């Protein structure tokens, strides 16, 4: 007798699979089950049960089923979906398969299988000019300022933010490599005249009468003789700034001055008069260097002619002293 076992099998199946909503919505007859079980006979398991013990494991239409077990999906779709219409089978089949491939538009993979970087933003010269100008004013932008600048330049706020981040990094890197800019060299003593320049007689630094001078600070040239300033042309004497030593020697020989010609003044300087001109002689300069026949240079000031002319007393008065 083969009929009783066939009648008991659908009853047990209906009891075991009564929890499926698909089976409840689509009732089938016993003849359909018989045809379905007859086709699934080669795939029968022990005890004549063609399915696994877990009713949710290989169900193609169940959302918790295994979508990757293609070997089990094929016989189940032939056995379980045999009584459904073609539209239901196609709908359940597509519902069971889940496509795990990402969207082709989101793929940024090059030929080596690595993720490609986003394309670099190319800024125009006008945009770079405005961005640099704003960076000079402030290195950090608030949200309203960033939105306003982005709308003004036709950029997104993200592009403006990234540009400022890169610019700050570059600025910090330059400051770390080059260090802080050197402080401006102050010139607090630039207004005070240099005593060496005063003694050398440079224009604009004339030494006042009676100011202390130090010949040791002067640069000696021409065999130990102090530098002489260019003398103003007077009485046919040649003017040559490079030949100061020859000019000093010629002046000493022409004047033929004596010790009586020297006159101490109140300002602590010694003055001598020659050819109607008044000259000053530093008290630190030895008198032997000022005598005729010596090649000593006598420091003078360039504006000596503008100074007040002192009237010397008669020679007889000097001899009495």
Curated annotation (Swiss-Prot):
Record's subcellular location:
Nucleus
Q: Which residues bind DNA?
A: 116-175
Q: What is its main location?
A: nucleus
Polar residues: compositionally biased ranges: 187-202, 215-224
| Residues covered by region (Disordered) | 79-118, 173-244
Biased composition annotated in UniProt, kind: Basic and acidic residues: 90-106
Which is a Gene Ontology cellular component entry for this protein? Answer: nucleus
Task: Please name the GO terms of the biological process aspect recorded for this protein, alphabetically.
Answer: cell differentiation; regulation of transcription by RNA polymerase II
* Highest taxon above the source species: Eukaryota
Named from the GO MF annotations, one term is:
RNA polymerase II cis-regulatory region sequence-specific DNA binding
Read off the Pfam families from this record: Homeodomain
Report the SUPFAM superfamilies cross-referenced here.
Homeodomain-like (SSF46689)
The entry's keywords = Developmental protein, DNA-binding, Homeobox, Nucleus
Q: Which family does it belong to?
A: Belongs to the distal-less homeobox family.
The name of this protein is Homeobox protein DLL homolog
């Amino acid at each position: 007798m083969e009929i009783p076992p066939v009648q008991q099998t659908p009853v047990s199946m209906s009891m075991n699979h009564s929890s499926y909503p698909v089976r409840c919505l689509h009732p089938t007859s016993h003849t359909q089950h018989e045809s379905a079980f007859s086709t699934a006979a080669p795939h029968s398991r022990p005890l004549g049960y063609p399915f696994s013990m877990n009713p949710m494991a290989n169900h193609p239409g169940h959302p918790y089923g295994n979508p990757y077990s293609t070997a089990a999906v094929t016989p189940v779709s032939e056995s379980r979906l045999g009584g459904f219409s073609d539209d239901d089978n196609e709908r359940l089949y597509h519902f069971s398969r889940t496509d795990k491939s990402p969207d082709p538009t989101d793929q940024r993979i090059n030929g080596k299988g690595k993720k490609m970087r986003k394309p670099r933003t190319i800024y125009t010269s006008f945009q770079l000019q405005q961005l640099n100008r704003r960076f000079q004013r402030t290195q950090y932008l608030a949200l309203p300022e960033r939105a306003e600048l982005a709308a003004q330049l036709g950029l997104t706020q993200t592009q403006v933010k990234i540009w400022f981040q890169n610019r700050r990094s570059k600025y910090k890197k330059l400051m770390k490599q080059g260090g802080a800019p050197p402080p401006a060299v102050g010139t607090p003593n630039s207004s005070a005249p240099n005593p060496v320049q005063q003694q050398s007689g440079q224009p604009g630094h004339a030494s006042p009468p009676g100011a202390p001078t130090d010949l040791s600070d002067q640069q000696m040239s021409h065999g130990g003789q102090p530098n002489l300033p260019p003398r103003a042309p007077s009485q046919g004497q040649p003017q040559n700034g490079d030949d100061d030593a020859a000019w000093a020697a010629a002046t000493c020989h022409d004047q033929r001055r004596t010790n009586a010609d020297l006159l101490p003044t109140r300002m602590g300087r010694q003055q001598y008069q020659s050819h109607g001109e008044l000259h000053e002689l530093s008290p630190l300069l030895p008198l032997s260097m000022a005598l005729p026949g010596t090649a000593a240079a006598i420091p003078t000031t360039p504006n000596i002619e503008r100074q007040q002319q002192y009237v010397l007393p008669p020679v007889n008065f000097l001899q009495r002293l």
